[in-house]
Amino acid sequence: VPNLQEVACVYGSKVGIAATKNNGKNWYYVGTANLPEPMQGQSTFWAPDVFKHKDTYYMIVTFIPGIHPFWGGDARLVFYKSKDLMNWDLVEEIEGTHGCIDASAFQMPDGTWKMWYKTPDSKTNTGVSKDLTTWKVTGKCEIDDVPHEGPIVFYWKNKYWNIIDECNLGYVGLHCYESDDATNWTYNSTILDKPGLRPDDFDQGRHCDVVVIGDRAFIFYFTHPGRTYKMDGMEVEENTWNYHRASIQIAELEYVDGKIVCDRDKYAKKVPSPIERKKK
């Protein structure tokens, strides 16, 4: 779409669906989820968190009415359920989440559910649900040491983990926190803060999700492969297609000497980065 102002290109988005037939080696585009919108008009969906409980799929997603040229809009978290991942029923707009985005939900040992999300002041707050029919925000902040977004919680290696994306235009990567109780978090490590070698993997890792399969954990993250950086690590900002373009990547997490590490180049074949291509 030509002549979009500032960040308007990231608004008006739907929830896209991709699928794989060979255990994640290759993916293909399926379409967009059929989500009843809480209000009429062209709106925006961001950061869906999808999980399954018994025979039903659930989704907590950021909903923003309208298209905006600058970061903003009346965001809130909305809760859906589905039997087939394509067609969804609206359960509720989660009360108390206006201005909040990027939810992640996980079931606790007592059977209740907990969610983590970004507040308007870029901290991680929480909410709870007893039976996935309604959510209640707690008002409790659990991570606030750096401004951040996109908290993702999972259980692996006998610990709870929360990976966040620091709100910074510099090259900072993703920060990992660990916890024994999914409430009190301690910084563990930073990953995906160095350029990778795979196609479109030259940028820092951004907003992620993690899938645990047995004893292995795989991180899905996105990059902006067309972006370049100054000597001080800050982005050279542009309002161009190449600057805004995003690519989804997958890598494996490893647990080494008590730390989460991620070698994004473990299976890579080197290709030239945007900077290397410009030098030719």
Residue ranges and their predicted role:
Residues 1-280:
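Carbohydrate-active catalytic/glycan-binding domains of CAZyme proteins
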